[in-house]
From Swiss-Prot:
Its cofactor is Zn(2+). Zn(2+) binds at C21, C24, C39, C42. It is found in: Cytoplasm, Cytosol; Cytoplasm; Rough endoplasmic reticulum. GO terms for molecular function: structural constituent of ribosome; zinc ion binding. The keyword Endoplasmic reticulum applies. Component of the 40S small ribosomal subunit. PANTHER family: 40S RIBOSOMAL PROTEIN S29 (PTHR12010:SF2). One of its GO terms (cellular component) is cytosolic small ribosomal subunit. The gene is RpS29. It comes from Lysiphlebus testaceipes. One of its GO terms (biological process) is cytoplasmic translation. Pfam families: Ribosomal_S14. This is Small ribosomal subunit protein uS14. Keywords: Cytoplasm, Endoplasmic reticulum, Metal-binding, Ribonucleoprotein, Ribosomal protein, Zinc. Disulfide bonds: none annotated.
Length: 56
């Protein structure tokens, strides 16, 4: 039994481990609202490109 078989043998169908950022593959701080599926760091970087505007 190799290393890969031990740690990644459990199916990841739901929960935090099943989702990752679509631009950087990070698993922490995912924004799923409106189907974005990007982490909060990438959201700050790409928010204006996506069409979000900062309100004062």
């Amino acid at each position: 039994m190799g290393f890969e078989n031990i740690w990644f043998s459990h199916p990841r169908k739901y929960g935090q481990g099943s989702r990752s950022c679509r631009s950087c593959a990070n698993k922490h701080g995912i924004i799923r609202k409106y189907g974005l599926n990007i982490c909060r760091q990438c959201f700050r970087e790409y928010a204006s490109d996506i069409g979000f505007k900062k309100l004062d």
